[in-house]
From Swiss-Prot:
GO BP terms, alphabetized: photosynthesis, light reaction
Keyword Transmembrane helix attached: yes
RNA-binding listed as a keyword: no
Species for this entry: Cereibacter sphaeroides
Ranges facing Periplasmic side: 47-51
Pfam family for this entry, one: LHC
Protein family: Belongs to the antenna complex beta subunit family.
Assembly information from the UniProt record: The core complex is formed by different alpha and beta chains, binding bacteriochlorophyll molecules, and arranged most probably in tetrameric structures disposed around the reaction center. The non-pigmented gamma chains may constitute additional components.
Protein's UniProt name: Light-harvesting protein B-800/850 beta chain
Record's subcellular location: Cell inner membrane
SUPFAM superfamilies associated with the record: Light-harvesting complex subunits (SSF56918)
Cytoplasmic compartment spans: 2-23
Length: 51
């Protein structure tokens, strides 16, 4: 087994592949955070003991 200098340890992805995965992970985190923010706002608005 030879070492591929284009691969990043320990994932075995290339730098471009790792950057693409990271970009999608950040996007997913932002979408999840936005949905959570909306859900928390709706829960706060709908519960009488908080308002």
């Amino acid at each position: 087994m030879t070492d591929d200098l284009n691969k990043v340890w320990p994932s075995g992805l290339t730098v471009a592949e790792a950057e693409e995965v990271h970009k999608q992970l950040i996007l997913g985190t932002r979408v999840f955070g936005g949905m959570a923010l909306i859900a928390h706002f709706l829960a706060a608005a709908a519960t009488p003991w908080l308002g």
